[in-house]
Amino acid sequence: MKNERALVVFSGGQDSTTCLFQALADYSEVEVVTFNYGQRHAAELDVAREITSELGVKHHELDLSLLSQLTSNSLTDHSQSITTNEDGLPSTFVDGRNHLFLSFAAVLAKGRGIRHIITGVCETDFSGYPDCRDSFIKSLNVTLNLAMDYPFVIHTPLMWLDKKETWALADSLGAFDFVRKRTLTCYNGIIGDGCGDCPACELRKKGLDAYIEEVQHT
């Protein structure tokens, strides 16, 4: 796909940064879009700007702060603690987030003549978010194509990878140290290895430890 262009939904976290490095290897031109939705870890906006500036990637930033007016969760309401709800979902789940992100990304992509959209959602080793499921992404892809009469292709390179395999992918792309030290996954806004306690950090560390152990025994 070296003669194609792509738009990466980008947060500056482990997953989207790994997707960005893969996109840079696979496509002739790559742009990214980041969303400001009043997230607890607002530092991710600065991290996204720094990473894209360093890599020389065109960066679009869109304001979706209205999300905090529509739904209550601990990712946009800083007064809430991060817990697990009765339905088993972390309190950090933001209703409609990926639906809106991908819909706005598609509008932007079409306007720029891009049909490939890349997102780092994953169903294998995740927090149970329903909008990270493969069935949702495929359904939305069809809906967006019909809604805008445009041949979008939503790519989910991490969908069936666990966190250990995601670290392995970053390593194969020559980006292991960059992803480990420069990205922000932590819900408490701590770059790199994070706080170690929030759900995002726990998943990241579990995968990192497993990958390092595997490499050491290879």
Curated annotation (Swiss-Prot):
It comes from Exiguobacterium sibiricum (strain DSM 17290 / CCUG 55495 / CIP 109462 / JCM 13490 / 255-15). Its cofactor is Zn(2+). Homodimer. NCBIfam families: 7-cyano-7-deazaguanine synthase QueC. Binds 1 zinc ion per subunit. Pfam families: QueC. CDD domains: QueC-like. Zn(2+) binds at residues 186, 195, 198, 201. GO terms for biological process: queuosine biosynthetic process. ATP binds at residues 10-20. Its EC number is 6.3.4.20. This is 7-cyano-7-deazaguanine synthase. Belongs to the QueC family. One of its GO terms (molecular function) is zinc ion binding. Coiled coil: none annotated. The keyword Zinc applies. Catalyzes the ATP-dependent conversion of 7-carboxy-7-deazaguanine (CDG) to 7-cyano-7-deazaguanine (preQ(0)). The keyword Amino-acid biosynthesis does not apply. Pathway: Purine metabolism; 7-cyano-7-deazaguanine biosynthesis. PANTHER family: 7-CYANO-7-DEAZAGUANINE SYNTHASE. It catalyses: 7-carboxy-7-deazaguanine + NH4(+) + ATP = 7-cyano-7-deazaguanine + ADP + phosphate + H2O + H(+). Keywords: ATP-binding, Ligase, Metal-binding, Nucleotide-binding, Queuosine biosynthesis, Zinc.
